[in-house]
A protein has these predicted regions:
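P/S/T/G-enriched low-complexity
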Residues: 36, 199, 203-248
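Acidic/histidine-rich, surface-exposed loop or edge segments in extracytoplasmic proteins
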Residues: 34-47, 121-127, 201-205
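Bacterial signal peptide processing site
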Residues: 22-26
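Extracytoplasmic/secreted cell-surface and envelope-processing proteins
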Residues: 48-52, 83-87, 167-171, 211-214, ...
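Von Willebrand factor
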Residues: 34-154, 157-159
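Sec-dependent bacterial lipoprotein signal peptides
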Residues: 1-21
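VWA/integrin I-like adhesion module and closely mimicked acidic/polar interface patches used
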Residues: 165-218
Length: 248
């Protein structure tokens, strides 16, 4: 039987998952109360600078380095429009049956991280960034809520690598302004706000210094409250350098 190298495994799996979700566990089942689930929304829209994107990618790479058996990682492109749907990828690392890592388990973890880094490269594609027509944070949150619901009782963290400026025809925070409280109440009454109760939300990439940035932050504070969660001031940041700070 042919033995694949780590790079070969990464390339083969990443090629398969370029535009689809790797829905299965990386190596079989996972114990329901083991590990954490990380859901990452990746915004590469034109409103973000190269420095912003480089910082976001480094943070995600560092987070991948910290993943352990039992953890699940989900990557979602913050995007709407164009001929292609938003890209996404999700997979997890199996928890060792006896709780102790074998050499095979360690290789499995390394292979998972290699695939995750390839997926990160795909989602931070600079050519793809030029095709993005709108930034759909609301759609990303709805998809993230679906993944959080299916996280199999893992503690779940939603990391948004974004400036948090929504740009869709219905809500364009640049050209049409920021929706008011009545808009949030209307959506909440119609049960159109995705529920993220119990999910730790962390934002890295937001404008935290200007008046407009403060207004956008105030909007999201109220929106996340309606979604059943809360973003603490320490977790709504322009930049996070240490992945250990991705926590509540």
């Amino acid at each position: 039987m042919m033995k694949l190298t780590h790079a070969g495994i990464a390339f083969a799996l990443a090629t398969f998952a370029v535009s689809a979700t790797g829905c299965g566990d990386a190596s079989g089942g996972v114990s329901p109360n083991k590990g954490r689930a990380y859901i990452v929304g990746i915004d590469i829209s034109g409103s973000r600078t190269k420095t912003d994107l480089d910082e976001s990618r480094k943070l995600l790479d560092d987070l991948i380095d910290r993943l352990e058996p039992g953890d699940r990682l989900t990557l979602i492109e913050v995007y709407q429009g164009g001929r292609q749907p938003a890209r996404q990828w999700s997979d997890s690392i199996r928890t060792p049956r006896n709780g102790e890592l074998t050499g095979s388990d360690r290789r499995r973890v390394d292979d998972f991280k290699s695939v995750a880094r390839v997926q990160t490269s795909i989602l931070f594609d600079s050519v793809r960034a030029k095709e993005i027509q709108s930034t759909d944070i609301f759609g990303t949150l709805a998809r993230a809520a679906d993944y959080a619901e299916a996280s199999r009782n893992r503690p779940t963290t939603l990391l948004l690598l974004s400036d948090m400026i929504n740009e869709t025809p219905s809500v364009n925070m640049i050209s049409k302004g920021i929706p008011g409280d009545s808009w949030i109440r209307h959506l909440s009454a119609e049960k159109r706000i995705p529920q993220l109760r119990g999910v730790c939300v962390v934002v890295a990439g937001a404008d935290v210094s200007s008046a407009r940035g403060a207004a956008i932050r105030e909007f999201w504070d109220k929106y996340f409250e309606a979604a059943g969660t809360h973003v603490s001031p320490d977790n709504y940041r322009n930049m996070i350098s240490d992945p250990a700070e991705i926590a509540c």
